[in-house]
């Protein structure tokens, strides 16, 4: 990933500004078959309706957006299938992720196309355990949710690509290389590729993880 700091806590407004009457975008991933944009829209601005040749996934980090007839708030997500006409309207000053990726039907998991999803409602906590559920699964790109009971965690490990973590609920302690960091709901962090990291829940903790492997 580029244009975003790695291994430190991120606040959306510190990564991309919201400016009066403007639409702003930053490329985080720009590959032939995958792009991830971080975008901001000022209140009462819009992106005109368009058709796209690949699936589009949107995740709201701040504000209120309207996609056709679906209103999305913080921590809500929507997936549009290819060749579907839709536009984006900002009801408030807003920041969101746009992911464009070509998907086969079996690579879209546990997600209804064209309908908003409140991510914290998609996965229940398991007492004394960790639960996860895939939303998108390709060899080089994955999007999934995880729910940790308080005190539960992953063993330190490395990933073959950068992983963007979005804290949805609760608080956790992270290891990134030799640094320990705390993260809480509303914050994000990028785990750098091939760097030891882990997650240990301080309270019950839910997160969305986006993993991109640049082959």
Predicted regions and their residues:
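A short, N-terminal "cap"/entry segment at the start of jelly-roll beta-barrel domains
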Residues: 1-33, 74, 93-95, 100-140
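A cytosolic small-molecule/anion-sensing beta-strand core signal
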Residues: 61-62, 92, 168-169, 184-185, ...
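Short strand-coil-strand connectors
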Residues: 32, 68, 91, 175-179
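Conserved short histidine dyad/triad with adjacent acidic residue
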Residues: 21-24, 33-52, 128-131, 142-159
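Ligand-binding loop in jelly-roll beta-barrel domains
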Residues: 71-73, 82-106, 193-215
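Glycine- and acidic-residue-biased ligand/ion/polar-headgroup-sensing regions
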Residues: 53-67, 161-177
